[in-house]
Design a protein with these regions (language model features):
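Sec-dependent N-terminal signal peptides
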Residues: 4-16
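Loop/turn elements at helix/coil->beta-strand transitions in domains of secreted/extracellular proteins
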Residues: 21-24, 48-52, 76-80, 105-107, ...
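Active-site-proximal beta-strand elements of phosphoester/diester hydrolases
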Residues: 22-32, 110-112, 138-148
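Active-site beta-strand/loop signature of hydrolases that rely on acidic residues for catalysis
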Residues: 23-30, 46-67, 100, 141, ...
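Acidic/histidine-rich helix-loop elements
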Residues: 27-38, 117-120, 149-154
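Active-site neighborhood of phospho(di)ester-bond hydrolases with catalytic His/Asp-centered motifs
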Residues: 54-55, 82-85, 179-184, 205-210
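Structured beta-strand-rich core segments of catalytic domains in phosphoester-bond hydrolases
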Residues: 59-137
Length: 241
């Protein structure tokens, strides 16, 4: 995501209509969690609205531990997190991915680690995934933070590779057909570069870039770079915060 003088990501979420209760899943670019001053109490109020949140730009585990501690002390739920096994990025900048979630909502949680590239440099930050089970709904959740780069060409190349990410995790657990891909893609989801991901896997994006912007700059809503890709046949509702 291109940053201006002041920039944050809007948190996007989906709610799955399950029996006997719904679960809400969100994606959030935390803007260097652990490396700068954060109002963790305010952040926890936002995060606590959801059951499972995929986090990008986690700089270290210290920030996650602090967020978890505040959530546990200010909500009625017990919270836990998974952090990616390695930091990803360039030699000058690296970050972790993480999931933070309400323990009572999930009976099974397992890290599937970072995507293993077929060819070197498919992604500047290889996506990270985990498998979750909530009541009768089990799924793989993949989170991503695409390159911004010096030109749009870099972003297009990465976007065209997300079909391979989907296939990688699908092949890793062949019996799992519920796979969610979310994050900060630095391109709108209706870009042609995402067509292979959408068409080959019967997916749709939940935020229409034509109507909704998801990135805030010092000048207001700037672009629609954050999104969630999900099976077209799933029942869900969408919200922006």
């Amino acid at each position: 995501m291109k940053r201006f003088i002041l920039s944050i990501s809007i948190l996007i979420s989906i709610s799955f209509q399950l029996f006997p209760e719904n679960i809400t899943i969100a994606s959030f670019n935390t803007l260097r969690l652990g490396n700068n001053v954060k109002d963790y109490r305010t952040l926890s109020k936002i995060v606590s609205k959801f059951d499972l949140i995929g986090l990008e730009e986690v700089m270290n585990e210290k920030g996650l531990k602090k967020l978890k501690a505040v959530l546990n002390s200010t909500t009625k739920s017990e919270w836990e997190y998974i952090i990616s096994e390695k930091a990803v990025g360039s030699k000058d900048y690296k970050e972790y991915y993480a999931f933070i979630y309400k323990k009572e909502k999930f009976q099974y949680v397992k890290s599937l680690q970072n995507f293993k590239e077929i060819n070197q440099n498919m992604f500047i930050r290889e996506p990270f995934a985990a498998r979750f089970k909530s009541n009768n709904f089990d799924f793989i959740y993949i989170i991503c933070h695409s390159i911004f780069g010096e030109t749009e060409k870099n972003r297009i190349i990465e976007a065209s590779n997300y079909d391979k990410v989907y296939s990688y995790y699908s092949n890793l657990i062949p019996e799992e057909d519920d796979i969610i891909i979310a994050g900060d893609f630095n391109l709108p989801a209706n870009d042609l570069a995402f067509q292979s991901l959408l068409n080959n896997n019967n997916l749709s994006y939940v935020i229409d870039p034509y109507w909704f912007k998801t990135t805030l700059s010092d000048k207001g809503l700037a672009s629609s770079y954050d999104n969630i890709f999900i099976n077209k046949e799933k029942c869900y509702t969408v919200s922006l915060i």
